[in-house]
Amino acid sequence: MSFLKLTKSIQKINNFNNNKINLINKYFSTTNINNSGGGGNIKLNDGRIFKFEDKQTPLTIANKINKTIGKQSILSRLNGNKLISMKEIIEMSGKDYNIEFLNFEEHSDARICFWNSSSLVLARATMEYFKNENKEIELINFGHLVNPQTADNINQGTFYIDIFFKDKNQTIKDNDINKIKKIMEYIVKRNDKFEILKNDQQDQDQDQEESFIKFGEFKFKNNFLTIDSSNSIVSLDLIKNSSVVGPNKEYSELQRIVGISFPSKDQMNNWVEIQKIAALRDHRVIGKDQELFFFHPFSPGSCFFLPHGTKIYNKLLQFLRLEYRKRGYQEVISPNIYNQKLWETSGHWDNYKDNMFSFECDHTQYSLKPMNCPGHCLMYAHRARSYKELPMRIADFGVLHRNETHGSLSGLTRVRRFQQDDAHIFCTPDMIREEIKQCLDFMKYVYTIFNFTFHLELSTRPDSYLGELSVWEKAETSLSQVLTEFCGDKWTINHGDGAFYGPKIDIHLKDANGKNHQCATIQLDFQLPIRFNLEYSGGLNNNNNNNNNNEEINDNNNNNSLNRPVMIHRALFGSVERMMAILMEHTAGKWPFWLSPRQCIVIPVSNKFNQFAQEIQSKINLAGYDVDVDLNDSKLLSKKIREATVSQYNYIIVVGQEEIDTNILNVRKRDLPEDNKQVKLSLNDLFSEFKLNIEQFK
């Protein structure tokens, strides 16, 4: 099926679903129920009020209003904040409630509930299957896989389980997946109920309530809400199985099964069509077709970039290097290998050593660096610093290595060897606000060039935070103010999800396919400067970035004291490899001229004009543009042009006797309409157009 037909098919499905929702909403607005008697009032989101008697459940309320609502609702929200199941009893006597019914199509909370429930079906089916196979497993994790920033997309959520084989040589095979799916389908048809069981346990200090979900003969310890019964899962599939990193040495490697499910076959069909479109844009396919990169089992997770892929990679770095020059960053080069003592000082050895490649040399333990920040702290600390040197913005494109499990490796999006557009800013506390603002402006500039939209999220103090509470509160207040100045109220708070060393701003970008990615991050770090004893001298009332509305975090600044700087971690691409993967899928391999590895190709109409074609190629090449020439005499001219078009050359230059005589080139532009692709240009005019394309990022 063609890309266009797939897109039209999905649009028809979406239009059909939207029409159904509109008809239901229209019915609600014209229907009223007025039960007589005592009880309480139920107010809906649209403002209508209904009176109900006795004890009610959201399901009985919904069915009395409209049975379609009762059928489609998965959860309900009581009084604007409390999520309850459709079967939970509401005491109506003398009380009024606001209630909202949540369906799968429109509400992320409902989808999360649905996929959590689906994970229990998968867990039960998997345990039943391996029990019959006499293989011992342990269920470690289960639930939904929904990024908070992708939760608004019906087609970007899944469910999963992680299991541990007692026999570590065991793995999940395709045949196992097929049989587990059949058991799931049987469980769904049987329409088993999900039951919430609660055990009250008296603790010495407090009452603790543990929740269990009983499903068939199995009990699952968890407190998430579920659907009422399994037959609400109309359509399901298992789409992936792989190994993932376990939580500790005892469970060092787990086996993960990922599935997808929907309450209607139409939604599943829609999802399948979208996967077909995604397959056409898969960066692994584009990378192979355009000869950009490949992987080899002799070095798993480490990419081999071919010449054309390297051109894109270097252009991305060149783009950032030019911006660094404009924005006051200094590029540095730091070592790849560090003594274990560095990682003990930074705290990574206790928390991250399992993700590091380590080895022994001269009876000393060393590791390949997985991040640049500790090395940059050494750079800051190698001599005394004054407040006059701050802010110090240093950037590093050094190679990083992280020991990802083999099963988690996936194209360029999850690798072991990569480079980050990593930068660290050392500044005084009262510079934080201005530096964060500049980082956000930088991010917006970059993402606008790539035609990404984005959403900002402030992650605040976690329970495991280190440092003074007052420092955290002032930092979070400062970041909140900057975000509000930057984008008004179009940002969200992710409570308790900050790093232990400081709050952070996560940036979630959306590509042309509607897929969300977290690449950029801006993090405050109060702990590494303490661990590495970083200091600067002086600073009272001497900073150009003072803001009367921004309190200083460090109140001990004076000209004779040594003060602690704040460290800001900043990345825009995340890893260059991952950004390349996103851009491949975002552009579907149709690179804009400024990034393109195939900017131009020269094709002679016959071998008689090969020399002239080579002369044109040489001039374009020496002018600094990526140009090829096709001198293959065994191919017809039409085939050469067709192959160049499929290969996504931005410009195709065809030369023959007329071009020699007139010194005017016959140029075909990829991005012009089909009936207007060919133009006549002199070589100088062509260079002017190339230069303009690069300046305007076209």
Curated annotation (Swiss-Prot):
InterPro entries, per database record: aa-tRNA-synt_IIb, aa-tRNA-synth_II, aa-tRNA-synth_II/BPL/LPL, Anticodon-bd, Anticodon-bd_dom_sf, Beta-grasp_dom_sf, TGS, Thr-tRNA-ligase_IIa
Gene Ontology terms for molecular function: ATP binding; threonine-tRNA ligase activity
SUPFAM superfamilies documented for this protein: Class II aaRS ABD-related, Class II aaRS and biotin synthetases, ThrRS/AlaRS common domain
Principal subcellular localization: cytoplasm
Region (Disordered): 541-560
Entry-linked Gene3D superfamilies: 3.10.20.30, Anticodon-binding domain (3.40.50.800), Bira Bifunctional Protein, Domain 2 (3.30.930.10), Threonyl-trna Synthetase, Chain A, domain 2 (3.30.980.10)
Keywords associated with the record: Aminoacyl-tRNA synthetase, ATP-binding, Cytoplasm, Ligase, Nucleotide-binding, Protein biosynthesis
Residue span, TGS domain: 38-100
Gene Ontology BP terms: threonyl-tRNA aminoacylation
Reaction catalysis annotation: tRNA(Thr) + L-threonine + ATP = L-threonyl-tRNA(Thr) + AMP + diphosphate + H(+)
A GO CC annotation given for this chain: mitochondrion
EC id: 6.1.1.3
UniProt key word Ubl conjugation: no
Protein's cellular compartments: Cytoplasm
CDD domains, sorted: TGS_ThrRS, ThrRS_anticodon, ThrRS_core
Family matches, as NCBIfam families: thrS (TIGR00418)
UniProt record similarity statement: Belongs to the class-II aminoacyl-tRNA synthetase family.
Annotated PANTHER family: THREONINE--TRNA LIGASE 2, CYTOPLASMIC-RELATED, THREONINE-TRNA LIGASE
Name listed for the protein in its UniProt record: Probable threonine--tRNA ligase 2, cytoplasmic
Name of the gene: thrS2
